[in-house]
Amino acid sequence: YLTDETTEKFPETEISGIDKEAAIEQVKSILDEIGVEVSKPRVYSLTYEKLEENTDYSQTDPNGNAPHQWTEEDAAYAIVFKGTIDTLPITEVGYRSGPAAGERIVGIVGKQGLIAFHALNIYELETENELSDEILTTQTVLENIQQKFRNIMITDKVEIEKINLEYVPVLKNVEKGEYELKPMFVCMARQNIEHSTDKEDNGLIGDSSIFPIIFDAQTGMEIQIGGTY
């Protein structure tokens, strides 16, 4: 999955020898052809140098195979779109609420053209309903987050980096495979965690974790990640 951490691992904006705008248009043309409305994409530059840097060649996959040996020909753009309905994006975060999941649209374009295209969990709108309540303010969402952590003993600070209003799919009918797209505030939180080392100097090493916190935009109720809504 491509997450906020991917930006930190692949910070470059361009790849020599690959036209970024042409790469974006190549993926966008597929989405236009199948009738998927999308927002402006995020583009990650998967350069050869960073692919090498972020690959642990000492690790093997479950079948015992060693990682791919990268070359400069492997450099590519990872182009990530969010599906939208009336310009409001459908979430792509990796939450789970029963069998519902966020929408994921990714195209990989290299020097030889399109390498891979994934469009997962694409939702087709059948009917529209009026909202039963007004959308909450972001201030209310922040207060809900403060309340969430108020009675939890944590030693490492949690920072909210993003608050986005997005549609989140919620399972409505299992047999018919029907979902309801509900407006939610998707909050991306970062927690920097320090671990003690085994060294005699009792040193500390840092680690960072990014995770979503999701609230119903009308009721303020939190979706429990991994459970039912």
Predicted segment positions?
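Conserved histidines in hydrophobic membrane contexts and catalytic metal-binding motifs
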Residues: 27, 107, 185-191, 220
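Structured segments of extracytoplasmic/periplasmic soluble domains
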Residues: 26-37, 144, 148-152, 187
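Charged, low-complexity helical/coil segments in non-catalytic cytosolic or luminal regions
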Residues: 97-181
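A general secondary-structure signal for short beta-strands and their flanking turns/coil
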Residues: 74-78, 100-102, 180-184, 208
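Generic short beta-strand segments
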Residues: 82-88, 166, 188-194
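Preferential activation on post-signal-peptide N-terminal prodomains/segments
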Residues: 1-96
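Accessory, solvent-exposed terminal regions and/or long lumenal/extracellular loops of proteins
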Residues: 178-182, 192-196
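A short, surface-exposed beta-strand/turn
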Residues: 1, 90-119, 197-229
